[in-house]
């Protein structure tokens, strides 16, 4: 069963807020902007992560210099799962943030 439009937006909003909170509390040198449902995280080395919602597909998209990734929400696990690799969003973010910022952050709740 696919997500309703309202449920999808609630999930993306909650995920983006959780990401903002986590990055705020991390102590990393970065800038964040959330505009029109697009969350951009800019690291001090110039790399960035861009999270956007794709309403027609009910997907959360992540753009990084290593590529674009599309995540579907799995109601059973309560996690965003990459449609291609089946990697959890939190796992991917832990790896990407380590590669971009050299810091280990815990994204288990994402």
Swiss-Prot record:
The keyword Transmembrane does not apply. One of its GO terms (molecular function) is ferric iron binding. It holds the Pfam family Frataxin_Cyay. Coiled coil: none annotated. One of its GO terms (cellular component) is cytosol. InterPro entries: CyaY (IPR047584), Frataxin/CyaY (IPR002908), Frataxin/CyaY_sf (IPR036524), Frataxin_CS (IPR020895). Gene3D superfamilies: Frataxin/CyaY. GO terms for biological process: iron-sulfur cluster assembly. Keywords: Iron, Metal-binding. Transmembrane segments: none annotated. It comes from the Bacteria. SUPFAM superfamilies: Frataxin/Nqo15-like. NCBIfam families: FeS_CyaY. Belongs to the frataxin family. Involved in iron-sulfur (Fe-S) cluster assembly. May act as a regulator of Fe-S biogenesis. This is Iron-sulfur cluster assembly protein CyaY. The gene is cyaY.
């Amino acid at each position: 069963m696919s997500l309703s439009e309202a449920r999808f937006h609630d999930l993306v909003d909650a995920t983006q807020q959780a990401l903002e909170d986590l990055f705020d509390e991390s102590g990393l040198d970065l800038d964040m902007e959330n505009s029109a449902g697009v969350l951009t995280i800019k690291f001090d080395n110039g790399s960035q992560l861009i999270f956007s919602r794709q309403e027609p597909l009910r997907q959360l998209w992540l753009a990084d210099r290593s590529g674009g990734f599309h995540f579907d929400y799995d109601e059973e696990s309560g996690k965003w799962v990459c449609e291609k690799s089946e990697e959890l969003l939190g796992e991917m973010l832990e790896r990407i943030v380590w590669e971009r910022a050299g810091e280990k952050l815990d994204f288990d709740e994402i």
